[in-house]
Amino acid sequence: MIGKLTGTVTDLCQESLILDVGGVGYNVFTTRRLIDSLRTGQNLSLYIEHYFLENINKLYGFECRKSQEVARMLSKVKGINYKIALSLLNHLELGELILAIQNKDESRLKIKGIGEKLVKRIITETYEDFLKLDSHLSGIASSTNVHIASEAVSALVKLGFQHKPSHKVVMEIMTKRPAIEIAELITLALKML
């Protein structure tokens, strides 16, 4: 089984890329976000999930082990496959996805192809496992800080700011000042947005 591939990107497609490893081109499905950040000729390493089902043989690639682990956890939910897991990772940053499940935030998980029943099933079946994960890869460690960050982002979105820039600014502030109070966090974030 393939666990990791390192090679040169030769082609970029809508949902996948071709990774040349020693003269062999592997078609690897990954997030649109990653595809958009790459260019042909670039070297790349991806953690691989090799999916077999009857006559289907697909490779799914992830930039880091944590993304791979999250996709693996999601794929265990009835109705979720790696393609849908990639859609969720494309829609939400890794830390946001983990936070959404930890906070049982159903609205954040509703995307094309995932209805209300499936969102509830994702939360019900993965909640305990996701509680064991760190929600942000750099800086926010305690569950209190995770809650403060989530509340701050929600407040900024309710004030009319887009979620992605709000999340980025909040994480930037919290990485530098993990013990910040929520009111000060929102005030600083408003100044930066």
Swiss-Prot record:
The RuvA-RuvB-RuvC complex processes Holliday junction (HJ) DNA during genetic recombination and DNA repair, while the RuvA-RuvB complex plays an important role in the rescue of blocked DNA replication forks via replication fork reversal (RFR). RuvA specifically binds to HJ cruciform DNA, conferring on it an open structure. The RuvB hexamer acts as an ATP-dependent pump, pulling dsDNA into and through the RuvAB complex. HJ branch migration allows RuvC to scan DNA until it finds its consensus sequence, where it cleaves and resolves the cruciform DNA. This is Holliday junction branch migration complex subunit RuvA. InterPro entries: DNA_helicase_Holl-junc_RuvA_I (IPR013849), NA-bd_OB-fold (IPR012340), RuvA (IPR000085), RuvA_2-like (IPR010994), RuvA_C (IPR011114), RuvA_C_sf (IPR036267). It comes from the Bacteria. Its main location: cytoplasm. GO terms for cellular component: cytoplasm; Holliday junction helicase complex; Holliday junction resolvase complex. Belongs to the RuvA family. GO terms for biological process: DNA recombination; DNA repair. Has three domains with a flexible linker between the domains II and III and assumes an 'L' shape. Domain III is highly mobile and contacts RuvB. NCBIfam families: ruvA. It is found in: Cytoplasm. Residues 149-150 are annotated as: Flexible linker. Residues 150-193 are annotated as: Domain III. GO terms for molecular function: ATP binding; four-way junction DNA binding; four-way junction helicase activity. The gene is ruvA. Residues 64-148 are annotated as: Domain II. Residues 1-63 are annotated as: Domain I. Homotetramer. Forms an RuvA(8)-RuvB(12)-Holliday junction (HJ) complex. HJ DNA is sandwiched between 2 RuvA tetramers; dsDNA enters through RuvA and exits via RuvB. An RuvB hexamer assembles on each DNA strand where it exits the tetramer. Each RuvB hexamer is contacted by two RuvA subunits (via domain III) on 2 adjacent RuvB subunits; this complex drives branch migration. In the full resolvosome a probable DNA-RuvA(4)-RuvB(12)-RuvC(2) complex forms which resolves the HJ.
